[in-house]
């Protein structure tokens, strides 16, 4: 079962800030999180039932460090459309 510890952060990029005007929040999670798991976490911890959830899987970038190849962690990104007038005020919890 999904837990709130699987949510890494709420993304604040130029694109996500433009989407917030339309009631969409972008959330970065661990790769094992599912749409139903995220919906349950949002309902339990934030008291919000999302209208829709879209997800995409992001592969970690390959980077060089001191001449050696390394890879950043993989993650999932969720675009969560919230009902009209609802926000995640206690998102820092």
Curated annotation (Swiss-Prot):
Q: Which GO terms describe its biological process?
A: translation
Q: Entry's Gene3D superfamilies?
A: 3.30.70.330
**GO: which molecular function terms?**
rRNA binding; structural constituent of ribosome
Q: Give the record's keywords alphabetically.
A: Ribonucleoprotein, Ribosomal protein, RNA-binding, rRNA-binding
Question: Which residue spans adopt a coiled-coil conformation according to this UniProt entry?
Answer: none
| One term under GO cellular component | ribonucleoprotein complex
Q: Which domain of life is it from?
A: Bacteria
Keyword RNA-binding assigned to the entry: answer is: yes
Instruction: Please verify whether the record's keywords include Glycoprotein.
Output: no
Q: What does this protein do?
A: One of the early assembly proteins it binds 23S rRNA. One of the proteins that surrounds the polypeptide exit tunnel on the outside of the ribosome. Forms the main docking site for trigger factor binding to the ribosome.
Q: Into which family does the record put it?
A: Belongs to the universal ribosomal protein uL23 family.
Which HAMAP family does the protein's record reference?
Ribosomal_uL23_B
| Name recorded for this polypeptide | Large ribosomal subunit protein uL23
Organism source for this protein?
A: Campylobacter jejuni subsp. doylei (strain ATCC BAA-1458 / RM4099 / 269.97)
Q: Which gene encodes it?
A: rplW
């Amino acid at each position: 079962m999904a837990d709130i510890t699987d949510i890494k952060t709420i993304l604040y990029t130029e694109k996500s800030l433009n989407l917030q005007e339309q009631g969409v929040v972008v959330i970065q999670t661990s790769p094992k999180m599912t749409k139903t798991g995220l919906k349950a976490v949002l309902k339990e911890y934030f008291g919000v039932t999302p209208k829709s959830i879209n997800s995409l899987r992001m592969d970690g970038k390959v980077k060089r460090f001191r001449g050696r190849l390394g890879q950043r962690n993989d993650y999932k990104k969720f675009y969560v459309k919230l009902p009209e007038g609802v926000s995640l005020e206690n998102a820092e919890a």
